[in-house]
């Protein structure tokens, strides 16, 4: 009987790896470990933000599903407004949204004006931080919710701190809470393809003397590490009509992005009572790329003169829906942006993105 030829070191390594993979699959199930080339490469599923410029700045057309995102900025900068617009876009695509209102400050009438279907929105107003994050975990595990927004990290107070004496120090309690919760949440978020957005506030660092950024966000460093997207939103200009203030010019900077190049910016108007002005973006971006021609203060679309001054053109486009949709279609085609859809998590079961948490 002929002897089997001795295995080369490389063949022995391959056989050992094959045995290990078989053992892992028997113990933990099919697809527990695989080569990246074996998985289905699909476009990252996203939920649009409601802002064309911000979708463009994010590089993938919106907030990625199956990942953690953070929106932070000063007070009254538009953090909750942006989050509500993302919820509205999710609902337009047939998705289910949940809003965990740790601040107990959600204005449902304002949310409705931004396009949120409040009768379909799941809302929770938890008593303490552990409860809020536990509710978020259960919603994500259900795989039946497309987006969960937590407003805000600063309001996620540990139960021990709430039950303590006013003024008593609980050093690092919130940071430990966030670190523990995110360790638990991230794997589930990825499997369920739920988009989870944390709204955060900024604080001034104590003792910073001239070097480095004096601002920091609340809740420790865990959220910074676990977030795939971090957006810094700021009001940069007050919009006035004579003496009447009607909105603010807002800048969003993508300071961290694991799914596309970071440090891109978006500029848009937030109008009081109606939120992000998509029509204003059509004018700004359309002028930048040449879809809308600007001569002095006059604007034109093709052979059609739109009017003089941005506010007059904005009013015209809001009244003339057919014209507005035509401008938007031309702009989106020029920018190469694809329409989004809510993806069933089961469609991409086991699929891996190029960059994990």
UniProtKB/Swiss-Prot annotation:
Chain residues that bind ATP: 73-80
Source organism, top-level taxon: Bacteria
A cellular component annotation (GO) from this entry: cytosol
Principal cellular location given in the protein's record: cytoplasm
GO molecular function (one): ATP-dependent DNA damage sensor activity
Keyword match DNA damage: yes
InterPro entries registered for this protein in UniProt: AAA+_ATPase, DNA_recomb/repair_RecA, DNA_recomb/repair_RecA_CS, P-loop_NTPase, RecA-like_C, RecA-like_N, RecA_ATP-bd, RecA_C_sf
Keywords from the named record: ATP-binding, Cytoplasm, DNA damage, DNA recombination, DNA repair, DNA-binding, Nucleotide-binding, SOS response
GO aspect biological process, one term: DNA repair
Compartment list: Cytoplasm
Keyword Cytoplasm: yes
Classification via PANTHER family: MITOCHONDRIAL DNA REPAIR PROTEIN RECA HOMOLOG-RELATED, RECA
HAMAP family (UniProt xref): RecA
Role description: Can catalyze the hydrolysis of ATP in the presence of single-stranded DNA, the ATP-dependent uptake of single-stranded DNA by duplex DNA, and the ATP-dependent hybridization of homologous single-stranded DNAs. It interacts with LexA causing its activation and leading to its autocatalytic cleavage.
Family to which this protein belongs: Belongs to the RecA family.
Protein name as it appears in the record: Protein RecA
Organism: Nitratidesulfovibrio vulgaris (strain DSM 19637 / Miyazaki F)
């Amino acid at each position: 009987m002929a002897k089997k030829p001795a295995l080369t070191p490389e063949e022995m390594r391959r056989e050992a790896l094959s045995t290990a993979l078989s053992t892992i699959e028997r113990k933990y199930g099919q697809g527990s470990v695989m080569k990246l080339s074996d998985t289905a490469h699909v476009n990252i599923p996203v939920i649009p933000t409601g802002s064309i410029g911000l979708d463009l700045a994010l590089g993938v057309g919106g907030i990625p599903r199956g990942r953690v995102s953070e929106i932070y900025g000063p007070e009254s900068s538009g953090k909750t407004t942006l989050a509500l617009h993302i919820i509205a876009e999710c609902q337009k695509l047939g998705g289910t949204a949940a809003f965990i209102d740790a601040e107990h400050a959600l204005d449902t009438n304002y949310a409705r004006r931004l396009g949120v279907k409040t009768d379909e929105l799941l809302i929770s107003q938890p008593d303490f931080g552990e409860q809020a994050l536990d509710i978020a975990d259960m919603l994500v595990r259900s795989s039946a919710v497309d987006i969960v927004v937590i407003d805000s990290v600063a309001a996620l107070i540990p139960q021990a701190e709430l039950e303590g004496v006013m003024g008593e120090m609980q050093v690092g309690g919130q940071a430990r809470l966030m670190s523990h919760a995110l360790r638990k949440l991230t794997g589930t978020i990825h499997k369920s393809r739920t988009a989870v957005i944390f709204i955060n506030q900024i604080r001034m660092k104590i003792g910073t003397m001239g070097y480095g950024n004096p601002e920091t966000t609340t809740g420790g460093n865990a959220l910074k590490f676990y977030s795939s997207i971090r957006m810094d939103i700021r009001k940069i200009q007050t919009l006035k009509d004579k003496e009447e203030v009607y909105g603010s010019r807002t800048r969003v900077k993508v300071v961290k992005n694991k799914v596309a190049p970071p440090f891109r910016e978006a500029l848009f108007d937030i109008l009081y009572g109606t939120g992000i002005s998509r029509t204003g973006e059509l004018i700004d971006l359309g002028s930048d790329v040449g879809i809308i021609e600007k001569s002095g203060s006059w604007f034109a679309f093709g052979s059609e003169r739109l009017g003089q001054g941005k506010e007059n053109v904005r009013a015209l486009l809001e009244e003339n829906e057919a014209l507005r949709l035509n401008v938007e279609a031309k702009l989106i085609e020029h920018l190469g942006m694809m329409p989004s859809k809510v993806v069933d998590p089961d469609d991409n079961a086991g699929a891996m993105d190029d960059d994990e948490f």
